[in-house]
């Protein structure tokens, strides 16, 4: 949560904790001072109350209603989101589904942080996102001049993906990573690439050189 708030709202971890503490005091979310990312079995058994309460939270009401109607939340106790052994002090922060009248007294950042907590919570009851991936390996013949080294080949590689079924991203939020945007393909373009077979020849209209820098791997 702190990472999301820092990235989206440019607030510090301390500010995030203080904000969630305010939400807790207003009965909007559960105990904030926890590092747990899972729920307890006991909480999972009563999770329908939390979801049911969010049916009155207008921005996400339709999603909460859908989850309640489908009844998928009933099996959450057996999912990866519930693990008593991974909880040391308190389970993950989730919306209580109560105190929604207190939202009117919150500032903009506090309301946004609550919205993130509610979205991340409801998203666990949606299926995984599905992507369609295409990988290309293009080989180009190199013809050298008379008297120079023999002819050869050089290869070019490209990977593309398209969001086929947003799944939980429908509610959690669609990715906005710049790298993904650069490789975004239309359905028509993806269909053309997907129809290629090994050995197919493609006419090359031009070559462009683009300078760039690779990113070092994360230390942690």
Identify the function of each model-found stretch.
Residues 2-220:
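Core catalytic DNA strand-manipulation module of type IA topoisomerases
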């Amino acid at each position: 949560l702190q990472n999301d708030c820092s990235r989206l709202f440019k607030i510090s971890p301390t500010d995030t904790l203080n904000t969630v503490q305010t939400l807790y005091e207003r009965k909007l979310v559960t105990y904030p001072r926890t590092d747990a990312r899972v729920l307890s079995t006991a909480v999972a058994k009563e999770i329908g109350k939390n979801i049911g309460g969010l049916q009155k939270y207008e921005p996400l009401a339709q999603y909460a209603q859908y989850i309640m109607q489908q009844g998928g939340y009933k099996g959450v106790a057996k999912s990866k989101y519930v693990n008593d052994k991974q909880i040391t002090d308190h389970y993950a922060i989730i919306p209580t589904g109560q105190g929604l009248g207190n939202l009117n007294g919150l500032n903009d950042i506090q309301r946004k942080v609550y919205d993130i907590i509610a979205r991340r919570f409801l998203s666990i009851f949606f299926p995984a996102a599905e992507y369609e991936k295409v990988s290309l390996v293009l080989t180009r013949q190199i013809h050298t001049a008379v008297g120079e080294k023999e002819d050869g080949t050089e290869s070019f590689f490209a990977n593309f993906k398209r969001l086929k079924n947003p799944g939980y991203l429908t509610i959690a939020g669609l990715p906005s990573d710049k790298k993904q945007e650069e490789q975004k393909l239309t359905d028509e373009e993806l269909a053309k690439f997907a129809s290629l077979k090994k050995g197919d020849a493609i006419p090359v209209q031009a070559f462009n050189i683009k300078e760039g820098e690779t990113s070092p791997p994360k230390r942690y």
